[in-house]
Amino acid sequence: MSGFRVLDLVKPFSPFLPEVIAPERKVQFQQRVMWTIITLLIFLVMSEIPLYGIASSDSSDPLFWLRMMLASNRGTLMELGISPIVSSGMLFQLLQGTKIIHVDMQNKNDRETFQTAQKLLAILLAVGQATVYVLTGMYGPPSSLGVGVCSLLILQLVFASTIVILLDELLQKGYGLGSGVSLFTATNTCEQVFWKAFAPTTSTSAKGTEFDGAVVAMFHLLGSRKDKKRALIESFYRPNLPNMFQLLATLLVFFAVVYLQGFRIELPMKSTRQRGPYGSYPIRLFYTSNIPIMLESALASNIFIISQLLFMRWPNNLFVKLLGTWDARAGSSQLYANGGLAYYIQPPFNFTDALLDPIKTTIYIAFVLGSCAVFSTTWIEISGTSPRDVAKQFKEQGLVIAGHRDTSAYKELKKIIPIAAAFGGATIGALSVVCDLMGTLGSGTSILLAVTTIYGYYELAVKEGGFNKSIVSGFSDGI
């Protein structure tokens, strides 16, 4: 390729960026499992190590409802979670999808430069987010902490984010299974759901001391109350603490997503190079997996962060108010959007709130479904799964769609793949909205990411580990 491109600006930084060297040969499945477990353990340890030097972390949390999805744990090395990686990926997706930057993903040098640019931006975003967090007083007044402690806090956050970037790269380059982003999110979500279901800790409310875990609370109420019916009802609908209805809603969503994973269109294929039985190429409903909802959440999280920080600094500015106004709910120091753009893209607290403000609910649903559909259709263009890319793969492998000419593969795929991507993205967005309205144990986004990731790992185990596929045959084989 000739001429100067914007992407070439990152090439001078390439030698200075940490990198995971790709394996020279394919890593065995057992070794990949081992490296995946090691990566997961490193993430879990970092999630429990508190930041050194913080005076307080009791201020309002801009990422309160997104921490589970971002695999973030406040006040620890994993404060930023996967936010820098996801935000960087989202930005470069938009730049490439709108043709602001031109990348030939079939060209190895272009692909490596593109990945380097994403990594560089992720590190720069980590530096920016860490600096904003520290200087806005999330860990105590900067004047009280001092320059040395503030610098140390920023350094810790950037170092931890760099480790997360490398762990993700380690998995994606073939040493492990899947991607670090999905793995960390799924692990964080499963951990939080398990804790909310079985936590033995207690909280004090107007009704007295109650167990935090929904299952533990149910057995305690049934064992300590004479009126079993009333105790059972309370365990299902108790406010302000995890309840059994939320747990059952979470399980319902889990099985619904697994069931929908099986929806697909099978294109019959035949080889032009050899005779034999026809194979098939599946085009699934969730063609782009959980990418759309992850990018939608990254977009929303950045709007929430910017809006809250600007409102804390300039609460009377008209532009800032249009972006979002914030206030704490009764009995909590946590700020929530109560006006502006941030309010309308913030999920309703529950189904009752959704009914009380139908305009907000309608705008929120339209935003989630629309952005997921757009991100999904854009993603196929840069991930090598567009109709043109798939048709090219067919041609290289000597495959054609049975009953069609060699040259008609692109036309046939163009009729199906973009629709599957858009509809699948909107569907996963709709499931996220349903989760938020039903009040599952965790946000709709995080639950969906966890389920699709777990299912993806199951498929990897079937494909590469030779495990029996009959586990979910009842959900998908007959579809």
Swiss-Prot record:
Signal peptide: none annotated. GO terms for molecular function: peptide transmembrane transporter activity; protein transmembrane transporter activity; protein-transporting ATPase activity; ribosome binding; signal sequence binding. The keyword Transmembrane applies. It holds the Pfam family SecY. The chain crosses the membrane at residues 34-54, 77-97, 120-140, 147-167, 247-267, 362-382, 416-434, 441-458. GO terms for biological process: misfolded protein transport; post-translational protein targeting to membrane, translocation; protein transport; retrograde protein transport, ER to cytosol; SRP-dependent cotranslational protein targeting to membrane, translocation. InterPro entries: SecY/SEC61-alpha, SecY_CS, SecY_dom_sf, Translocon_Sec61/SecY_plug_dom. Its main location: endoplasmic reticulum. It comes from the Eukaryota. It is found in: Endoplasmic reticulum membrane. Residues 55-76, 141-146, 268-361, 435-440 are lumenal. The keyword Hydrolase does not apply. It is a multi-pass membrane protein. Residues 1-33, 98-119, 168-246, 383-415, 459-479 are cytoplasmic. GO terms for cellular component: extracellular vesicle; fungal-type vacuole; plasma membrane; Sec61 translocon complex. Heterotrimeric complex composed of SEC61-alpha, SEC61-beta and SEC61-gamma. PANTHER family: SECY/SEC61-ALPHA FAMILY MEMBER. Belongs to the SecY/SEC61-alpha family. This is Protein transport protein SEC61 subunit alpha. It comes from Candida albicans (strain SC5314 / ATCC MYA-2876).
